[in-house]
Amino acid sequence: MSKKFSSKNSQRYVVVHRPHDDPSFYDTDASAHVLVPVSNPNKTSPEADLRKKDVSSTKPKGRRAHVGEAALYGINFDDSEYDYTQHLKPIGLDPENSIFIASKGNEQKVEKKNIEDLFIEPKYRRDEIEKDDALPVFQRGMAKPEYLLHQQDTTDEIRGFKPDMNPALREVLEALEDEAYVVNDDVVVEDISKKTQLQGDNYGEEEKEDDIFAQLLGSGEAKDEDEFEDEFDEWDIDNVENFEDENYVKEMAQFDNIENLEDLENIDYQADVRRFQKDNSILEKHNSDDEFSNAGLDSVNPSEEEDVLGELPSIQDKSKTGKKKRKSRQKKGAMSDVSGFSMSSSAIARTETMTVLDDQYDQIINGYENYEEELEEDEEQNYQPFDMSAERSDFESMLDDFLDNYELESGGRKLAKKDKEIERLKEAADEVSKGKLSQRRNRERQEKKKLEKVTNTLSSLKF
């Protein structure tokens, strides 16, 4: 008879997949699952019993005396099972193997700033409003109309077109944008007659000019028209002959006492140039008026001929060729086409040293001009027209061979040899295509064929 089943002596198994490291994993005849024995969860193993005995033997019999003292030294770990204070030592006993770590104080937490506070004035911030128990200026991320009123340059009451505005207020607003109403604090408008009495004869020309502009800025009508006309007299064209003799005698005498280059540094020749240009502009202004005749300007010519300054060169005609323009510039030297003055200040009287330098410069320039003229003359003399009879006998055949075998590509920038296959493809494409380029190529081919027929017939004739 078989023994009865006993759960105490039974063995429990579970069905699991066969592991990959099993030698029978790749065997097709073996099953994919295996039985693995497991222990009874209700039955304790002898190893577990031994482990419990070891733990129970290590537990202290009494309660620790230092539980809770670690927190006094800044140690926030649970010291119910381990005494962390045994590693602490009094300060000064072993300075080589111990260090002092101070406990952390109560740090103030930094409040997070709101992005809205970066764009709001201090008096409109949230914390200030809460102190004053005022309403917030922002609601749901948008500014209220009360806050936007403070950001406007001009209030809505006077902004835009206001036909019913007070005329006095309108004039004030227009004056704020008009430069004519702007008061210049730097310019003091004073009566010129009172100032001349105080300062006397030492009143400078520059100060007079400032007072003139100050009076103009002050505006208003003139007190006495006759006095105003006498004070600001315009240029008199009738006295132009003797004006330079009366006013510039001392300045003209400076040019007679020049002996070396150092004397030229003390002469303000630029003032003469500015005065010369100013006189010409005044004369041109009077010439443009119809009341002045051309006969009245004849008296100006002698003074211009005796002037130290040279005449302004006439602007060249645009119809000149490039070579003629280049020659004219070389003859002028460093002088410009418009002003006639050079970088070497040719308006100054030339000394002996400067004259020698000018002569040497002219000789060098003339040498270059003669060289260019000789080259042009040689080209004109040695020029011979093309003569086909003087060329070699096979020259024509060489040209024909070159034109038949080579062509220009890339828009005429590249010379390449003709390809018969490409020409054949082009002809086939031109026959099918209806574009303008294809039609033009077809016409050129037809004309070429006609020309070849004519040449063949002429070559076959015997004379």
Curated annotation (Swiss-Prot):
Coiled coil: 355-462
Motif stretch (Nuclear export signal): 168-179
Sites bearing N-acetylserine, chain numbering: 2
Amino acid composition bias (Basic residues), ranges on this chain: 321-332
Pfam families assigned: LTV
Alphabetical keyword list: Acetylation, Coiled coil, Cytoplasm, Nucleus, Phosphoprotein, Protein transport, Transport
Places the protein is found: Nucleus; Cytoplasm
GO-annotated biological processes: ATP export; cellular response to oxidative stress; endocytic recycling; maturation of SSU-rRNA; protein transport; response to osmotic stress; ribosomal small subunit biogenesis; ribosomal small subunit export from nucleus
Comp. bias (Basic and acidic residues): 46-56, 444-453
Modification after translation (UniProt): Phosphorylated, leading to its dissociation from the 40S pre-40S ribosome.
Family annotation (InterPro entries): Ltv1
Region of interest (Disordered), residue spans: 37-63, 284-345, 426-463
Bias-annotated ranges (Low complexity): 336-345
Biased composition (Polar residues): 454-463
Phosphoserine found at: 288, 293, 299, 303
Any one of the GO CC terms: preribosome, small subunit precursor
Residues in the signal sequence: none
Note: Present with 589 molecules/cell in log phase SD medium.
Function of the protein: Involved in protein transport. Non-ribosomal factor required for efficient nuclear export of the ribosomal 40S subunit. Component of the GSE complex, a GTPase complex required for intracellular sorting of GAP1 out of the endosome.
Family: Belongs to the LTV1 family.
Assembly mode: Associates with the pre-40S ribosomal subunit. Component of the GSE complex composed of GTR1, GTR2, SLM4, MEH1 and LTV1. Interacts directly with GTR1. Interacts with CRM1.
Protein name: Protein LTV1
Lineage: Eukaryota, Fungi, Dikarya, Ascomycota, Saccharomycotina
